[in-house]
């Protein structure tokens, strides 16, 4: 596919529905419908926004009586962001995740990171093929991007407290790709959602 350019004075933003108890949602930015009928574990496409201040309101699909989540965003130029709807119904919020527009895809290696978005799962250690990547990753935290040889990997989350395995996810990681693996859902029914991040496709000239 053609590369994507972040134009001067703008940024790119997408929304990820990661709230396991929440219904399908419509996303309004500054009172304008931007994404509709976004289901749990679904991503929107990236949209271009000018730098500035924005209000984000998330409604149950087809309604506009009361947003289930509202938040504000002060957007600088040159960013690439994922806005995740997270939490349980009694404590929903928006989490801004920086997709790091400076990170470049490589023809020699793959890159990935892990984000913990399960609201009822304590801090976890992340193992890659049984080797520790990071310890005590808490809800709403993410690892840094890690470069790794392309191939198939078992990515496992174990509770930091007692080393109980709570998720094993099989990931296929390719060259020229930058991925995020999101831990979503509620224990004991966790899921791994693998995303190719938009920084994979940014123009580099």
Model regions: which residues?
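Intrinsically disordered, low-complexity polar regions and short flexible loop motifs
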Residues: 1-205
């Amino acid at each position: 596919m053609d590369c994507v350019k972040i134009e001067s004075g703008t940024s790119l933003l997408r929304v990820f529905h990661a709230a396991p108890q929440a219904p399908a949602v419509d996303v309004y930015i500054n009172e304008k419908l931007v994404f509709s009928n976004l289901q749990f574990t679904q991503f929107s496409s990236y949209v271009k926004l000018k730098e500035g201040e924005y209000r984000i309101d998330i409604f149950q699909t087809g309604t506009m009586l009361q947003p289930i989540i509202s938040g504000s965003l002060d957007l600088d130029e040159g960013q690439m962001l994922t806005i995740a709807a997270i939490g349980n119904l009694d404590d929903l919020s928006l989490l801004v995740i920086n997709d790091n527009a400076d990170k470049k895809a490589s023809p020699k290696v793959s890159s990935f990171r892990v984000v913990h978005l399960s609201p009822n799962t304590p801090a976890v250690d992340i193992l890659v093929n049984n080797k520790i990547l990071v310890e005590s990753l808490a809800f709403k935290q993410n690892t840094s991007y890690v470069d790794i040889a392309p191939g198939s990997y078992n990515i496992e989350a174990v509770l930091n407290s007692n080393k109980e395995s709570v998720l094993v996810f099989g990931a296929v990681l390719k060259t020229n790709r930058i991925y995020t693996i999101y831990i979503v859902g509620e224990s004991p029914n966790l899921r791994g959602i693998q995303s190719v991040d938009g920084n994979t496709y940014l123009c580099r000239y």
